Amino acid sequence: MPNRVIIFDTTLRDGEQALAASLSVKEKLQIALALERLGVDVMEVGFPVSSPGDFNSVQTIAKTIKNSRVCALARALPADIDAAAQALAVAEQFRIHTFISTSTIHVESKLKRSFDDVLAMAVNAVKYARRFTDDVEFSCEDAGRTPIDNLCRMVEAAITAGARTINIPDTVGYTIPSEFSTIIETLFNRVPNIDQAIISVHCHDDLGLSVANSIGAIEKGARQVECTVNGIGERAGNCSLEEIAMILATRKDKLGLETGIVAKEIHRTSNLVSQLCNMPVQANKAIVGSNAFSHSSGIHQDGMLKAKNTYEIMTPESIGLHRNNLNMTSRSGRHVIKHRMEEMGYHTDDFDIDSLYEQFLKLADKKGQVFDYDLEAIVFMATQVAEDDHYRLQHLSVHSDSSEGVATATVRIKVEGEDLTEAAIGNGPVDAAYKAIARASGREVEISSYKLSAKGQGQDALGQVDITAKYQGRTFHGVGLATDVVEASAQALVHVMNLICRADKVADIKSQIQFNREHAGV
């Protein structure tokens, strides 16, 4: 049995299902490139038949990624498999991942078929997918609640049909480690052709057991783990990639297994996914949480000073989180900032040093010392602005009357090269700023959620504002970042306005395509 575990990342497919708003193609490509640097073996990047947008993003990523195998999901239906194959055809190497439900409750209540019918559909789907590639993966959806006799039959039939990877999902996170590992062990004992396929597991975290179940399965012979960065995913999330990777690295003495993960890329990738997906990592999250390497107990601190391994089973540096003893202030030169970005794992083509240094100096003048998370926040926001350039917030000033709770805001916004200035009165500074921006843009939106979080520590920390807004029946998510809360709030709304503008352009293009189709040959 091989001593290497294949890491199958599904951040861009299963992970994206947890997001309030879908990622853009550019954002998905950023994450895909980060996953490639991280060293994932396979990345599942979408469900092409689900929408033209998903098809386009899968195709774009498939064209770009060279060192990881790109995979797309398809139900056990010819149309789904056709869409996946067409989107992936541009890739140097690709996998089609097809699936069907196998548990009694799914077969009877959702599919309304007999198990034998479902078995035949699975076999036909695998055979059909093999027309396009030798790398076909088959998943038994809700395997954790599937009668073991049926599961053994399904796995044997799928392997015979040509599946080279068989995935056993705990779709609803129901099993406990002893149960799940027994399922894997039983498959190895009872399926006669099991040696002709890699056994994979895909565990959800509804009971907080996804990582434990995956490790239990590995101990019984599974050699692929499906996971996501930061454990994001539907409901309570998926098995966490960084936890699986570091368990296997840290406990190689016990498990004797390895992966192809470049551990020093973990922190950087986690931060990128958190920022782009607007899903903050909880402070006590294993491996990548802000407290993961913090020691506040006096006894622990004393031990750490004497020998770090008294209370650290891995180092921050091992995941790319460097302890920085260099203070970055307005007196720091451009080369210092460039060097620090490279120390944090960024490549020179990930950021524009001139733009970064300009924003760094502005921030340093405001808050004195600038920290790593400040630099990363500036880089992240630069990607947002670069993508959404229809509206630009040029100036914002606010005056508040604390006695009456009334505020006046004046904004200057650049709209496709033209400066527009508007003022408004509101119930507080944020409300006033929003009304002024609405006037300048000519769009009235409904704010359905508003969230403020600190990016750093202390009173001079950067503030991130995340809003969800509704406009003409559609939902948009915006983010803004600044040392001033009102400015961050204004930037978040401008971000929403740009997303609306982009959506309108896409709708116009779709309408034109539809018109051309309807009038072709007329």
From Swiss-Prot:
One Pfam annotation, family name?
Answer: HMGL-like
Give UniProt keywords alphabetically. Amino-acid biosynthesis, Branched-chain amino acid biosynthesis, Cytoplasm, Leucine biosynthesis, Manganese, Metal-binding, Transferase
Needed cofactors, names only, are: Mn(2+)
PROSITE patterns named in the record: AIPM_HOMOCIT_SYNTH_1, AIPM_HOMOCIT_SYNTH_2, PYR_CT
Its gene name is: leuA
Q: Which family does it belong to?
A: Belongs to the alpha-IPM synthase/homocitrate synthase family. LeuA type 1 subfamily.
SUPFAM superfamilies documented for this protein: 2-isopropylmalate synthase LeuA, allosteric (dimerisation) domain, Aldolase
Organism expressing this protein natively: Shewanella denitrificans (strain OS217 / ATCC BAA-1090 / DSM 15013)
Question: Per its UniProt record, what InterPro entries does this chain match?
Answer: 2-IPM_HCS-like, 2-isopropylmalate_synth_dimer, AIPM/Hcit_synth_CS, Aldolase_TIM, LeuA/HCS_post-cat, LeuA_allosteric_dom_sf, LeuA_bact_synth, PYR_CT
Q: Where is this region: Regulatory domain?
A: 392-522
Catalysed transformations (reactions): 3-methyl-2-oxobutanoate + acetyl-CoA + H2O = (2S)-2-isopropylmalate + CoA + H(+)
Q: Which residues bind Mn(2+)?
A: 14, 202, 204, 238
A Gene Ontology annotation in the biological process aspect, one of them, is: L-leucine biosynthetic process
Gene Ontology molecular function terms on file: 2-isopropylmalate synthase activity; acetyl-CoA C-acetyltransferase activity; manganese ion binding
Which proteins does it associate with, and in what oligomeric form?
Homodimer.
Q: What is this protein called?
A: 2-isopropylmalate synthase
Q: Where is the Pyruvate carboxyltransferase domain?
A: 5-267
EC numbers listed for it are: 2.3.3.13
